[in-house]
Swiss-Prot record:
Cytoplasm in keyword set: yes
Cellular component GO terms, alphabetical: cytosol
Protein name (Swiss-Prot/TrEMBL): ATP-dependent RNA helicase RhlB
One Pfam family per UniProt: DEAD
InterPro entries, alphabetized: DEAD/DEAH_box_helicase_dom, DEAD_box_RNA_helicase, Helicase_ATP-bd, Helicase_C-like, P-loop_NTPase, RhlB, RNA-helicase_DEAD-box_CS, RNA_helicase_ATP-dep_RhlB
Chain positions recorded as ATP binding sites: A53, Q54, T55, G56, T57, G58, K59, T60
Quaternary assembly: Component of the RNA degradosome, which is a multiprotein complex involved in RNA processing and mRNA degradation.
Gene Ontology BP, a term: RNA catabolic process
The encoding gene: rhlB
Organism, scientific name: Xanthomonas euvesicatoria pv. vesicatoria (strain 85-10)
Length: 573
């Protein structure tokens, strides 16, 4: 981005709807950024655009102005039903979709346009009811929208006049391109439909998508001297893994009160780093895939209001978040992808402001540094890790932000957030029948809290299954010895009393030469067994030593042959 973020081109110089111009002026937008000044002359007459610009340069406002102006000055298609949407804006992440919807409502609330926000992780039926009532503009992530289009036939895109693909390169990274193509084929042909595509990088695959589904798009590129924003001061430290948390605390203590984002590579480290910061008195929010969507929105809103000092996030929040006033971005872990580095540090120094991007190159992730420096075409200045930086400064008492007391509660602690997230995830799996330990269909019988399993003992412990008897086979010796009545009844149909007797716990009695061992307890059945008509004596089992089978007289053993051979050799000498 150039040092001059605004151009001399004004919004009033375009042929915009008067109500739209009034809304822009009331929101404080009078002059265009470079990407807006390039996009609007092409998009307002109805041309397709493939635009490339860095994050934070005003791409969102550029396509929102084009969409709203078209819907205000042009009539809908003749075959459109009142509930069919006229415009579709697709974003790769929930956070970006939420931000676009917030900006759209801000500018279009007084224009009579109806907006719908569609994304996963929230109430399905409520979104479906909103779509069935009819909207003008749908702002969505691809997955949830396809569910409404394909499975439930809630939305029809046959009358969609204009489609916007924001962060198209991120769509590829997240595997949404098949979904995008599916949705584009449900819209009017590209000669009738206007398509606006925006991306931080116009790679070969992005341009291939543009030329396949767009009508001779005009490629617009905002020229920049470097890949990263010019007003971002970058520096990098080389700490060990053990020094990273201490170094982070030391640097944070030297920038008290500044709005800060900390990026890590894994969801597990989001919780670990956030807990450490919270223990040292910082008010921390977290954004990761483990945090429920509603809680993410609440934490993001509090961070934007200044009620949270630090936001710890994975790359799910690296793109599309329009948060004003972020002064510091920490790469606690260097990202694997160089493009993710650019988008992370793009959270600061937006629209001409200044900011700092501080990265830690530990032994685990330092291998990513050469690729990052090659991608941004510059060397990142290296700062030494000194003992002074590893010593956090004492923190000054923090002044609460207005409205903080009403929103602050114990439920927003990091530990509580992740514990509730795990409990919610476990409850959802239980409702879907996904857990092994559930009472329904459980084999182990543990965790479900149900009754005793069939075939278990009175103490609840499992007993081994009996092998089925073969016709004519003699009863097992143990059964005959221990309880003649049970052994006699084994060949007949089992009755309830016999089955209960078999399940009753009992101590096995050893016998020597047919006599019980002295002191052994007799077996006690849980259910009385009827007396036999003719009692039999217990079978005696006598162990006898096993003798080797006699060898035939005609074939001497191996030892005999060896001995005979040795004697012949000795006598021969």
């Amino acid at each position: 981005m150039s040092d001059k973020p605004l151009t001399d081109v004004t919004f009033s110089s375009f042929d915009l709807h008067p109500a739209l111009i009034a809304g822009l002026e009331s929101a404080g937008f009078t002059r265009c950024t470079p990407i807006q000044a390039l996009t609007l002359p092409v998009a307002l007459p109805g041309g397709d655009v493939a635009g490339q610009a860095q994050t934070g340069t005003g791409k969102t406002l550029a396509f929102l102005v084009a969409v709203m102006n078209r819907l205000l000055i042009r009539p809908a298609l003749a075959d459109r039903k009142p509930e069919d949407p006229r415009a579709l804006i697709l974003a790769p992440t929930r956070e970006l979709a939420i931000q676009i919807h917030k900006d759209a409502v801000k500018f279009g609330a007084d224009l009579g346009l109806r907006f719908a926000l569609v994304y996963g992780g929230v109430d399905y039926d409520k979104q479906r009811e909103l779509l069935q009532q009819g909207v003008d503009v749908i702002i969505a992530t691809p997955g949830r929208l396809i569910d409404y289009v394909k499975q439930h036939k809630v939305v029809s895109l046959h009358a969609c006049e204009i489609c916007v693909l924001d962060e198209a390169d991120r769509m590829f990274d997240l595997g949404f391109i098949k979904d995008i193509r599916f949705l584009l084929r449900r819209m009017p042909e590209r000669g009738t439909r206007q398509t606006l595509l925006f991306s931080a990088t116009l790679s070969h695959r992005v341009l291939e998508l543009a030329y396949e589904h767009m009508n001779e798009p005009e490629k617009l590129v905002v020229e920049t001297e470097s890949i990263t924003a010019a007003r971002v001061r970058q520096r990098i430290y080389f700490p060990s893994d053990e020094e990273k948390q201490t170094l982070l605390l030391g640097l944070l203590s030297r920038s008290e009160g500044a709005r800060t984002m900390v990026f890590v590579n894994t969801k597990a480290f989001v919780e670990r780093v956030a807990r450490t910061l919270e223990r040292h008195g910082y008010r921390v929010g977290v954004l990761s895939g483990d945090v429920p969507q509603k809680k993410r929105e609440s934490l993001l809103n509090r961070f934007q209001k200044g009620q949270l000092e630090i936001l710890v996030a994975t790359d799910v929040a690296a793109r599309g978040l329009h948060i004003d006033g972020v002064k510091y971005v920490y790469n606690y872990d260097l990202p694997f992808d160089a493009e993710d580095y650019v988008h992370r540090i793009g959270r600061t120094a937006r629209l001409g402001e200044e900011g700092d991007a501080i990265s830690f190159a530990c032994e685990r992730y330092a291998m990513s540094l050469p690729d990052i420096e090659a991608y941004i075409e510059q060397k990142i200045p290296v700062e030494p890790v000194t003992s002074e930086l590893l010593t956090p400064l004492p923190r000054a008492p923090r002044v609460p932000v207005e409205g903080e007391e009403a929103d602050d509660d114990a439920g927003d602690s990091v530990g509580t957030i992740f514990r509730e997230a795990r409990e919610q995830r476990a409850a959802e799996e239980q409702r879907r029948g996904g857990g092994r330990s559930g009472s329904g269909g459980s084999r182990s019988g543990s965790g479900g809290g149900g009754g005793r399993r069939e075939g278990a003992g009175a103490d609840g412990k499992p007993r081994p299954r009996r092998k089925p008897r073969v016709e004519g086979q003699a009863p097992a010796t143990a059964a005959s010895t221990e309880h003649p009545v049970v052994a006699a009844a084994a060949g007949q149909a089992p009755s309830a009393g016999v089955a209960d007797a078999e399940r009753a716990p009992r101590k096995r009695r050893r016998r020597r030469n047919g006599r019980p061992v002295e002191g052994a307890e007799p077996a006690v059945a849980s259910t009385p067994v009827p007396a036999p008509a003719a009692p039999r004596k217990p079978t005696q089992v006598v162990a006898k030593p096993v003798r080797a089978a006699a060898k035939p007289s005609g074939s001497p053993s191996l030892l005999s042959r060896i001995g005979r051979r040795l004697r012949s050799l000795v006598s021969g000498n």
